Amino acid sequence: MRTLILDDEEPIVHMLAKVCEKEGHTVFPFTQSVDALIHLASTPIDLLITDMHMPEHDGMTVVREARRLQPNIFTLIITGHTSRYPIEDLMADGTADIMFKPFHMNELRTRLALAHRRRGLIDRLHQEKKALHAVSHEMIQGLEQELREATQGKQ
């Protein structure tokens, strides 16, 4: 999975990146939200892990923009508190998951597994839609051919 990590604290970014890499993720680490958003605009990302409170843009601003740029991105917000944003508001604005500080690395691994499973389901859905489209296209062509033959037979 391609994972973008955004936190204004370098040690946290490093720790998250280390765990994600051990889980097989390709990691894009950032400490500046502007740089992260520029990267999101040009590179497909499967998972966005972002802190809620940062100096330039808060996590919700980043999540909203990420979902605008990449609607299927899975987002995980890490926060120490929710007083500014109730959980319901976070979820309504596109956050897929929330993890509260302090957290254990096993909790992070569980969240990464959930994101990976979701990515797999989305990929499978796209494959099934493509296959369904191909089958329906063939059926329509067959029906159109039958209609042409029936029309020609009546003339």
Per-region residue spans from a language model:
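Two-component/phosphorelay signaling modules centered on CheY-like receiver
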Residues: 9-28
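Short hydrophobic/Thr-rich beta-strand motif most characteristic of the beta2 strand and flanking loop
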Residues: 24-31, 36-39
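Acidic catalytic/metal-coordinating carboxylates
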Residues: 31-32, 58-61
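Active-site beta3 strand of CheY-like receiver
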Residues: 43-49
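Receiver (REC) domain active-site loop signature in two-component systems and cognate sites
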Residues: 54
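Alpha4 helix (beta4-alpha4-beta5 surface) of REC/receiver domains from two-component response regulators
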Residues: 61, 82-97
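C-terminal output helix
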Residues: 85, 103-116
